[in-house]
Amino acid sequence: MTSNDPVRRAETLREQIRYHNYRYYVLDEPVISDAEYDALMRELRELEAAHPELVTPDSPTQRVGAPPSEQFAKVQHVVPMLSLANAFDEAGMRAWYDRTLRLLGSDAQVAFVVEPKIDGLAVTLIYRNGVLVRGATRGDGEIGEDVTANLRTISSIPLRLGSFANDDSAPTNPTAVPPLLEVRGEVYMRIADFMRLNEQLAVAGEKVAANPRNAAAGSLRQKDPAVTSRRPLRFFAYGVGQVEGVALQTQWETLHFLRALGFPVNRDARRFERFEEALAYCREWMTRRDELEYEVDGVVVKIDSFAQQAELGVVGRDPRWAIAFKFPAREAVSRLLDIVVNVGRTGVITPNAVIEPVNIGGVTVRNASLHNADYIAERDIRIGDYVIVKRAGDVIPHIVGPVVARRDGSERVWQMPATCPACGTPLERAEGEVAYRCPNFGICPAQITRRIEHFVSRSAMDIAGIGEKQVQLFVERGWVQDVADLYTLTPEHFHGIEGYGPKRIANLLNAIAESKDRPLHRLIVGLGIRYVGEVVAQILADHFGSLDALAAASADEIDDLEGIGPAIAASVAEYFARPESKALIAKLKRVGVRTEAKGPAVAPKGDALAGKTFVITGTLPSMSREEAGALIVAHGGRVSGSVSKKTDYLVVGSEPGGTKVAKAQELGIPTLDEAGLLALIGANDRSAPAASNNNQNAASATSRGTMAEVQQLGLNLE
């Protein structure tokens, strides 16, 4: 109940906002929606505007964010990292523009830069003489957290600045790297990468992230940089703090300057001479948000001129020269009717919410993810609760948390069932894992269905024409009990089934038959072994060459492979030790599925790299990492995904992974650039050349013939 006493109400609002700031900025676990948080801030602003005597120095309206976590060293920002005022409609945008003109003068010539407001984690990067020396989070705007080691692992953040002078909009002397440069930007995670990461975490029995922003924030704030290096983080630069040695005049010039130095800058940023044009671009963004590969929660409109920015100044926590045009919330409140559990292909039990239908962003949502039992317990989510439901882009809607204030006492605490809902087997939970599992691997019908769906998926055997409905039909009718049974289907099975005419049946059976000859690593992916995705499957296929050899390998033998850890090795060995797995492999052979690696499509060009193990990091000048890897393999070498004492060379391109470079230096492993790699191949010499700074002229003398070989391998170097 809202108090009529403005003093008490202001104190209450400040405490609520501080608490929610702590949940959002420090714990990365918000418990209210963005719209509800904005409503609290608006009420406090209006209250303080009506009663100026209530404004205190520590009011949330006078600060940014929350105190930093004690987990990392604190960093004092020399130039504060400001927040932004928000506008929620065009009327708010026009009010901001009118205020700007009143301050600058009605005859002022004002240009605007409009940039997408990426929903990630704001960071600052400090470069001295072109070398990254420190990186920190925004924290409360005054003090952040030192996450330098973790930021170094993000490949889109340059460790040393270069010059890309072909950007005509950069300053007149883009080759001069400033002696001091502080770059501000956003660390984020693409939606597709987020979904893949959550799948991996769920399979591993680890805690999943609620959304891409939380995934990015949690990944960046890992204590171990090695963990961060395995997360698909990206970076966009959008501004500067401290700068020495270059006089930047505008925001637009700054964006081009940053791009010229090698920073990724969002190419959807635009400059406009008129406010109405800028506003029209904001409207366009509202219609495009679902088409993007990353989450945005609005657009930022900035006054382009730094001189005008300085004239406008800052009030409280917000610069007067910029505003965030926030998009309508992709959240809604609905009632949680029930919690049902689904069974995954590896037996993981996942709770899902059944809610009263609610429209979120033009889509009717009836079901939402609850991730796992711990997620429900930590947030005290109960059946009958009114809950906040969030949907963003193509990400599955999920429950953020309950609206506790709306409880009436009829809500029920949910408990994870003791047995599998599909087969009745008692559930198990391994020590240290958040996931419950059904151990009835070979018989549980839900696991069978999920495994077949995975087997036919694009990343595995890629069988066209088979989806969830088809698999359900096959299993319900008893035609298919395991993936090998797919290859026993005949036209007679489909006789009399509605929707299955002769042409559709022929296409379906042809697609199944064609999949028998898929590469070995695709088959390994299709088996659905825990922790085994495309990269691990390729390593296993390359080393063992057949399912028989892989099945006969011990966990120790598998663990010895580059890029394979003990958890993966144990999972693979455990899978092939099961009687049902052995029976499945025998059955796959009987129905004609290839269980051995295919011969090389192109005969090896030589053995110049025989016995040598390479790791590739960064962006190479004339070929992708995949193309470089194919070239190494064609000359007898092998490629690994991680640096270890077994690595012979690290091939380094621009913007390399900091962890790999540091590990190579620690182990004394020689590094090569692209020219050095080509020289090593062209010289047909297995001895290690001088590391890193090989003679470019000598390399070029041998590279023409080698590049011709790349073309013969069918590799596109454009």
Swiss-Prot record:
Top-tier EC class: ligase
> Which coenzyme or cofactor does it need?
Mg(2+); Mn(2+)
Carries keyword Manganese? yes
Tagged with keyword DNA repair:
yes
For biological process, the GO terms are: DNA repair; DNA replication
Catalytic reaction list: NAD(+) + (deoxyribonucleotide)n-3'-hydroxyl + 5'-phospho-(deoxyribonucleotide)m = (deoxyribonucleotide)n+m + AMP + beta-nicotinamide D-nucleotide
Catalytic residues per the record?
Answer: K117
Q: Which UniProt keywords apply?
A: DNA damage, DNA repair, DNA replication, Ligase, Magnesium, Manganese, Metal-binding, NAD, Zinc
Q: Which SUPFAM superfamilies has this protein been placed in?
A: BRCT domain (SSF52113), DNA ligase/mRNA capping enzyme, catalytic domain (SSF56091), Nucleic acid-binding proteins (SSF50249), RuvA domain 2-like (SSF47781)
Q: What is its EC number?
A: 6.5.1.2
Q: Where does Zn(2+) bind?
A: C420, C423, C438, C444
List residues of the BRCT domain: 604-694
Q: Where does NAD(+) bind?
A: D34, A35, E36, Y37, D38, S83, L84, E115, R138, E186, K302, K326
GO terms, molecular function: DNA binding; DNA ligase (NAD+) activity; metal ion binding
- Entry similarity comment: Belongs to the NAD-dependent DNA ligase family. LigA subfamily.
Q: What's the stated role of this polypeptide?
A: DNA ligase that catalyzes the formation of phosphodiester linkages between 5'-phosphoryl and 3'-hydroxyl groups in double-stranded DNA using NAD as a coenzyme and as the energy source for the reaction. It is essential for DNA replication and repair of damaged DNA.
Q: What is this protein called?
A: DNA ligase
The organism of origin for this protein: Roseiflexus castenholzii (strain DSM 13941 / HLO8)
